[in-house]
From Swiss-Prot:
This is Protein VirB11. One of its GO terms (cellular component) is type IV secretion system complex. It comes from Agrobacterium fabrum (strain C58 / ATCC 33970) (Agrobacterium tumefaciens (strain C58)). One of its GO terms (molecular function) is ATP binding. GO terms for biological process: protein secretion by the type IV secretion system.
Length: 344
Protein backbone atom coordinates (compact mmCIF):
# COMPACT_ATOMS: atom_id res chain seq x y z
CA UNK A 1 0.00 0.00 0.00
CA UNK A 2 1.55 3.28 -1.10
CA UNK A 3 1.09 5.93 1.58
CA UNK A 4 1.11 9.66 0.89
CA UNK A 5 3.85 11.20 3.14
CA UNK A 6 1.48 14.05 3.89
CA UNK A 7 -0.91 11.62 5.59
CA UNK A 8 1.77 10.52 8.06
CA UNK A 9 2.58 14.16 8.81
CA UNK A 10 -1.09 14.95 9.46
CA UNK A 11 -1.42 11.94 11.77
CA UNK A 12 1.51 13.00 14.00
CA UNK A 13 -0.67 14.70 16.67
CA UNK A 14 -2.48 11.42 17.40
CA UNK A 15 0.43 8.98 17.03
CA UNK A 16 1.18 8.97 20.76
CA UNK A 17 -2.26 7.44 21.32
CA UNK A 18 -2.14 5.07 18.38
CA UNK A 19 1.28 3.82 19.50
CA UNK A 20 0.06 3.23 23.06
CA UNK A 21 -0.99 -0.43 23.52
CA UNK A 22 -3.59 0.67 26.09
CA UNK A 23 -5.53 2.62 23.45
CA UNK A 24 -8.66 0.98 22.08
CA UNK A 25 -10.18 3.87 20.17
CA UNK A 26 -9.53 7.48 19.19
CA UNK A 27 -12.68 9.49 18.43
CA UNK A 28 -12.34 12.92 16.84
CA UNK A 29 -15.77 14.54 16.70
CA UNK A 30 -14.74 18.06 15.71
CA UNK A 31 -11.57 20.15 15.31
CA UNK A 32 -9.54 20.84 18.43
CA UNK A 33 -10.40 17.82 20.58
CA UNK A 34 -10.13 14.05 20.75
CA UNK A 35 -11.63 11.37 22.97
CA UNK A 36 -9.29 8.46 23.66
CA UNK A 37 -10.65 5.17 24.96
CA UNK A 38 -8.40 3.27 27.35
CA UNK A 39 -9.39 0.73 30.03
CA UNK A 40 -12.98 0.86 28.78
CA UNK A 41 -13.53 4.62 29.19
CA UNK A 42 -13.16 7.71 26.99
CA UNK A 43 -11.04 10.65 28.17
CA UNK A 44 -11.00 14.05 26.47
CA UNK A 45 -7.76 15.64 25.23
CA UNK A 46 -6.95 18.83 23.29
CA UNK A 47 -5.90 18.14 19.70
CA UNK A 48 -4.08 20.79 17.64
CA UNK A 49 -5.72 20.04 14.28
CA UNK A 50 -7.94 22.22 12.13
CA UNK A 51 -10.97 21.37 10.03
CA UNK A 52 -8.79 21.41 6.92
CA UNK A 53 -6.35 18.97 8.55
CA UNK A 54 -9.14 16.54 9.40
CA UNK A 55 -10.63 16.82 5.93
CA UNK A 56 -7.20 16.12 4.39
CA UNK A 57 -6.74 13.06 6.63
CA UNK A 58 -10.13 11.79 5.47
CA UNK A 59 -9.39 12.33 1.78
CA UNK A 60 -5.90 10.80 1.92
CA UNK A 61 -7.02 7.84 4.05
CA UNK A 62 -9.88 7.15 1.65
CA UNK A 63 -7.44 7.22 -1.26
CA UNK A 64 -5.52 4.32 0.32
CA UNK A 65 -8.52 2.15 -0.59
CA UNK A 66 -9.17 4.02 -3.82
CA UNK A 67 -12.25 5.67 -2.35
CA UNK A 68 -13.15 9.19 -3.38
CA UNK A 69 -14.08 11.01 -0.16
CA UNK A 70 -15.79 14.40 -0.23
CA UNK A 71 -19.18 16.13 -0.14
CA UNK A 72 -20.63 13.71 -2.71
CA UNK A 73 -19.21 10.69 -0.86
CA UNK A 74 -19.09 11.81 2.76
CA UNK A 75 -19.03 8.37 4.40
CA UNK A 76 -16.05 6.05 4.17
CA UNK A 77 -14.81 3.00 6.07
CA UNK A 78 -11.10 2.50 5.45
CA UNK A 79 -7.78 1.78 7.17
CA UNK A 80 -4.80 3.88 8.19
CA UNK A 81 -1.27 2.91 7.05
CA UNK A 82 -0.56 0.80 10.16
CA UNK A 83 -3.83 -1.13 10.02
CA UNK A 84 -6.09 0.93 12.29
CA UNK A 85 -9.71 0.90 11.13
CA UNK A 86 -11.12 4.33 10.34
CA UNK A 87 -14.72 5.50 9.94
CA UNK A 88 -15.01 8.87 8.21
CA UNK A 89 -18.05 11.17 8.29
CA UNK A 90 -17.80 14.50 6.44
CA UNK A 91 -20.36 17.24 5.81
CA UNK A 92 -23.19 17.10 4.85
CA UNK A 93 -23.59 13.96 7.04
CA UNK A 94 -22.22 15.96 9.99
CA UNK A 95 -22.79 19.67 10.73
CA UNK A 96 -20.81 22.18 8.70
CA UNK A 97 -17.38 22.88 10.18
CA UNK A 98 -17.07 19.45 11.81
CA UNK A 99 -15.51 16.15 10.78
CA UNK A 100 -15.96 12.82 12.55
CA UNK A 101 -13.02 10.39 12.48
CA UNK A 102 -13.31 7.24 14.59
CA UNK A 103 -10.11 5.18 14.72
CA UNK A 104 -10.15 1.68 16.16
CA UNK A 105 -6.74 0.40 17.12
CA UNK A 106 -6.30 -3.36 16.56
CA UNK A 107 -4.92 -5.42 19.41
CA UNK A 108 -1.19 -5.94 18.93
CA UNK A 109 -1.22 -9.18 20.87
CA UNK A 110 -3.04 -12.48 20.35
CA UNK A 111 -3.61 -14.28 23.63
CA UNK A 112 -3.70 -18.04 24.09
CA UNK A 113 -6.72 -20.01 25.27
CA UNK A 114 -5.02 -20.44 28.63
CA UNK A 115 -5.38 -16.68 29.17
CA UNK A 116 -9.11 -16.46 28.45
CA UNK A 117 -10.15 -16.56 32.12
CA UNK A 118 -7.75 -13.76 33.02
CA UNK A 119 -8.63 -11.53 30.06
CA UNK A 120 -12.41 -12.02 29.91
CA UNK A 121 -15.02 -11.54 32.62
CA UNK A 122 -17.44 -14.44 32.12
CA UNK A 123 -19.24 -15.34 35.36
CA UNK A 124 -22.41 -16.39 33.50
CA UNK A 125 -20.95 -18.25 30.55
CA UNK A 126 -22.73 -21.53 31.46
CA UNK A 127 -25.88 -19.98 32.94
CA UNK A 128 -28.15 -19.78 29.89
CA UNK A 129 -30.91 -21.46 31.89
CA UNK A 130 -30.89 -18.50 34.29
CA UNK A 131 -31.71 -15.92 31.60
CA UNK A 132 -35.45 -15.93 32.29
CA UNK A 133 -34.85 -15.44 36.00
CA UNK A 134 -32.57 -12.45 35.32
CA UNK A 135 -35.12 -11.08 32.85
CA UNK A 136 -37.87 -11.39 35.47
CA UNK A 137 -35.69 -9.62 38.03
CA UNK A 138 -35.08 -6.78 35.57
CA UNK A 139 -38.84 -6.53 34.97
CA UNK A 140 -39.53 -6.44 38.71
CA UNK A 141 -37.10 -3.56 39.17
CA UNK A 142 -38.73 -1.32 36.56
CA UNK A 143 -42.25 -2.39 37.60
CA UNK A 144 -41.62 -1.09 41.13
CA UNK A 145 -41.21 2.42 39.70
CA UNK A 146 -44.20 1.92 37.38
CA UNK A 147 -46.49 0.72 40.18
CA UNK A 148 -45.36 3.36 42.69
CA UNK A 149 -46.76 6.11 40.46
CA UNK A 150 -43.68 8.36 40.57
CA UNK A 151 -43.43 9.46 36.93
CA UNK A 152 -40.07 11.24 37.25
CA UNK A 153 -38.45 8.26 39.02
CA UNK A 154 -39.94 5.86 36.47
CA UNK A 155 -38.64 7.83 33.48
CA UNK A 156 -35.21 8.18 35.10
CA UNK A 157 -35.10 4.42 35.70
CA UNK A 158 -36.00 3.82 32.05
CA UNK A 159 -33.15 6.03 30.86
CA UNK A 160 -30.38 4.76 33.15
CA UNK A 161 -31.66 1.20 32.73
CA UNK A 162 -31.18 1.56 28.96
CA UNK A 163 -34.78 0.78 28.04
CA UNK A 164 -35.64 1.64 24.45
CA UNK A 165 -38.27 4.38 24.55
CA UNK A 166 -40.72 5.49 21.87
CA UNK A 167 -42.45 8.84 22.44
CA UNK A 168 -45.67 9.32 20.46
CA UNK A 169 -48.12 12.13 19.93
CA UNK A 170 -49.34 14.64 17.35
CA UNK A 171 -47.35 17.68 16.24
CA UNK A 172 -46.85 20.14 19.10
CA UNK A 173 -47.73 17.65 21.83
CA UNK A 174 -44.41 17.91 23.69
CA UNK A 175 -42.79 14.64 22.62
CA UNK A 176 -39.66 16.30 21.19
CA UNK A 177 -39.37 18.49 24.28
CA UNK A 178 -39.54 15.39 26.47
CA UNK A 179 -36.97 13.59 24.32
CA UNK A 180 -34.51 16.40 25.07
CA UNK A 181 -35.27 16.08 28.79
CA UNK A 182 -34.69 12.32 28.72
CA UNK A 183 -31.46 12.65 26.72
CA UNK A 184 -30.23 15.10 29.34
CA UNK A 185 -30.67 12.32 31.93
CA UNK A 186 -28.33 9.93 30.10
CA UNK A 187 -25.10 9.54 32.13
CA UNK A 188 -22.69 12.25 30.94
CA UNK A 189 -19.77 9.89 30.27
CA UNK A 190 -21.65 8.02 27.53
CA UNK A 191 -20.73 8.47 23.86
CA UNK A 192 -23.84 9.37 21.87
CA UNK A 193 -24.46 9.21 18.13
CA UNK A 194 -27.62 10.92 16.85
CA UNK A 195 -29.26 10.25 13.49
CA UNK A 196 -31.64 12.98 12.28
CA UNK A 197 -32.81 14.66 9.10
CA UNK A 198 -32.74 18.07 10.82
CA UNK A 199 -30.84 19.19 13.92
CA UNK A 200 -33.66 19.12 16.49
CA UNK A 201 -32.18 17.28 19.45
CA UNK A 202 -30.10 19.00 22.11
CA UNK A 203 -27.08 16.94 23.19
CA UNK A 204 -25.28 18.21 26.31
CA UNK A 205 -22.79 15.31 26.36
CA UNK A 206 -19.25 16.25 25.36
CA UNK A 207 -18.58 13.03 23.45
CA UNK A 208 -21.22 13.04 20.74
CA UNK A 209 -21.56 13.06 16.96
CA UNK A 210 -24.58 14.48 15.09
CA UNK A 211 -25.28 12.52 11.89
CA UNK A 212 -27.64 13.91 9.25
CA UNK A 213 -29.46 12.14 6.42
CA UNK A 214 -31.32 13.51 3.41
CA UNK A 215 -35.08 13.35 3.21
CA UNK A 216 -36.07 10.97 0.42
CA UNK A 217 -32.38 10.45 -0.42
CA UNK A 218 -32.20 13.87 -2.10
CA UNK A 219 -29.45 16.47 -2.06
CA UNK A 220 -25.68 16.53 -2.17
CA UNK A 221 -24.06 13.47 -0.66
CA UNK A 222 -27.48 11.86 -0.32
CA UNK A 223 -27.39 9.20 2.37
CA UNK A 224 -30.19 7.41 4.17
CA UNK A 225 -30.75 6.78 7.85
CA UNK A 226 -29.67 3.20 7.28
CA UNK A 227 -26.36 4.35 5.74
CA UNK A 228 -25.73 6.41 8.87
CA UNK A 229 -26.70 3.52 11.12
CA UNK A 230 -24.11 1.29 9.45
CA UNK A 231 -21.49 4.02 9.89
CA UNK A 232 -22.45 4.63 13.52
CA UNK A 233 -21.94 0.96 14.41
CA UNK A 234 -18.25 1.49 13.58
CA UNK A 235 -18.01 4.55 15.84
CA UNK A 236 -18.08 2.87 19.29
CA UNK A 237 -21.37 4.41 20.47
CA UNK A 238 -22.82 3.78 23.91
CA UNK A 239 -26.21 4.78 22.47
CA UNK A 240 -27.55 5.61 19.03
CA UNK A 241 -30.40 8.12 19.17
CA UNK A 242 -32.69 8.29 16.18
CA UNK A 243 -34.76 11.47 16.06
CA UNK A 244 -38.24 11.25 14.59
CA UNK A 245 -39.08 7.91 13.02
CA UNK A 246 -40.49 8.23 9.53
CA UNK A 247 -40.07 6.56 6.15
CA UNK A 248 -36.77 4.67 5.76
CA UNK A 249 -35.68 5.67 9.27
CA UNK A 250 -38.09 3.05 10.66
CA UNK A 251 -36.02 0.12 9.43
CA UNK A 252 -32.86 1.79 10.72
CA UNK A 253 -34.54 2.13 14.13
CA UNK A 254 -35.38 -1.55 14.25
CA UNK A 255 -31.93 -2.57 13.00
CA UNK A 256 -30.26 -0.36 15.60
CA UNK A 257 -31.90 -2.00 18.60
CA UNK A 258 -31.67 -5.53 17.23
CA UNK A 259 -27.94 -4.93 16.61
CA UNK A 260 -27.38 -4.69 20.36
CA UNK A 261 -27.73 -0.96 21.08
CA UNK A 262 -30.66 -0.54 23.49
CA UNK A 263 -31.49 2.71 25.24
CA UNK A 264 -32.58 4.71 22.21
CA UNK A 265 -35.06 7.56 22.67
CA UNK A 266 -37.11 8.33 19.54
CA UNK A 267 -40.37 10.01 18.56
CA UNK A 268 -43.19 9.00 16.22
CA UNK A 269 -46.59 10.38 15.29
CA UNK A 270 -49.53 8.64 16.96
CA UNK A 271 -52.17 9.72 19.45
CA UNK A 272 -51.54 6.85 21.89
CA UNK A 273 -49.37 3.72 22.24
CA UNK A 274 -51.73 1.73 20.04
CA UNK A 275 -51.55 4.26 17.21
CA UNK A 276 -47.84 4.86 17.74
CA UNK A 277 -47.02 1.16 17.46
CA UNK A 278 -49.31 0.71 14.46
CA UNK A 279 -47.49 3.61 12.79
CA UNK A 280 -44.10 2.04 13.54
CA UNK A 281 -45.25 -1.34 12.25
CA UNK A 282 -46.62 0.26 9.07
CA UNK A 283 -43.44 2.25 8.42
CA UNK A 284 -41.18 -0.77 8.90
CA UNK A 285 -43.46 -2.92 6.77
CA UNK A 286 -43.37 -0.29 4.02
CA UNK A 287 -39.57 -0.38 3.84
CA UNK A 288 -37.86 -2.54 1.24
CA UNK A 289 -36.39 -4.73 3.97
CA UNK A 290 -39.54 -4.99 6.08
CA UNK A 291 -41.76 -5.84 3.11
CA UNK A 292 -40.03 -9.19 2.76
CA UNK A 293 -40.71 -10.22 6.36
CA UNK A 294 -43.72 -12.17 7.56
CA UNK A 295 -45.90 -10.16 9.94
CA UNK A 296 -45.21 -12.58 12.81
CA UNK A 297 -41.46 -12.28 12.32
CA UNK A 298 -41.66 -8.50 12.23
CA UNK A 299 -43.80 -8.38 15.38
CA UNK A 300 -41.30 -10.63 17.18
CA UNK A 301 -38.47 -8.29 16.16
CA UNK A 302 -40.39 -5.24 17.35
CA UNK A 303 -41.15 -7.01 20.63
CA UNK A 304 -37.42 -7.08 21.36
CA UNK A 305 -36.96 -3.50 20.17
CA UNK A 306 -39.55 -1.47 22.11
CA UNK A 307 -39.62 -1.40 25.92
CA UNK A 308 -41.70 1.71 26.61
CA UNK A 309 -44.20 3.80 24.62
CA UNK A 310 -44.98 7.20 26.16
CA UNK A 311 -47.93 9.17 24.67
CA UNK A 312 -48.31 12.95 24.75
CA UNK A 313 -50.93 15.53 23.94
CA UNK A 314 -51.26 19.26 24.51
CA UNK A 315 -54.02 21.38 26.07
CA UNK A 316 -53.13 24.93 25.14
CA UNK A 317 -49.72 25.47 26.70
CA UNK A 318 -50.03 22.43 28.99
CA UNK A 319 -48.48 19.10 27.97
CA UNK A 320 -50.07 15.88 29.17
CA UNK A 321 -48.47 12.44 29.50
CA UNK A 322 -51.02 9.75 28.72
CA UNK A 323 -51.22 6.06 29.61
CA UNK A 324 -47.73 4.61 29.22
CA UNK A 325 -47.35 1.16 27.65
CA UNK A 326 -44.58 -0.81 29.36
CA UNK A 327 -43.38 -4.13 27.98
CA UNK A 328 -42.70 -5.50 31.48
CA UNK A 329 -46.28 -4.68 32.51
CA UNK A 330 -47.64 -6.32 29.35
CA UNK A 331 -45.63 -9.48 30.06
CA UNK A 332 -47.04 -9.87 33.56
CA UNK A 333 -50.52 -9.58 32.05
CA UNK A 334 -49.70 -12.25 29.50
CA UNK A 335 -49.73 -9.81 26.57
CA UNK A 336 -47.18 -8.80 23.94
CA UNK A 337 -46.60 -5.68 21.91
CA UNK A 338 -48.24 -7.46 18.98
CA UNK A 339 -51.56 -7.30 20.82
CA UNK A 340 -51.56 -3.53 20.26
CA UNK A 341 -52.25 -4.18 16.57
CA UNK A 342 -55.66 -5.58 17.50
CA UNK A 343 -56.65 -2.65 19.71
CA UNK A 344 -58.30 0.63 18.84
Amino acid sequence: MEVDPQLRILLKPILEWLDDPRTEEVAINRPGEAFVRQAGAFLKFPLPVSYDDLEDIAILAGALRKQDVGPRNPLCATELPDGERLQICLPPTVPSGTVSLTIRRPSSRVSSLKEVSSRYDAPRWNQWKERKKRHDQHDEAILRYYDNGDLEAFLHACVVGRLTMLLCGPTGSGKTTMSKTLINAIPPQERLITIEDTLELVIPHENHVRLLYSKNGAGLGAVTAEHLLQASLRMRPDRILLGEIRDDAAWAYLSEVVSGHPGSISTIHGANPVQGFKKLFSLVKSSAQGASLEDRTLIDMLATAVDVIVPFRAHGDIYEVGEIWLAADARRRGETIGDLLNQQ
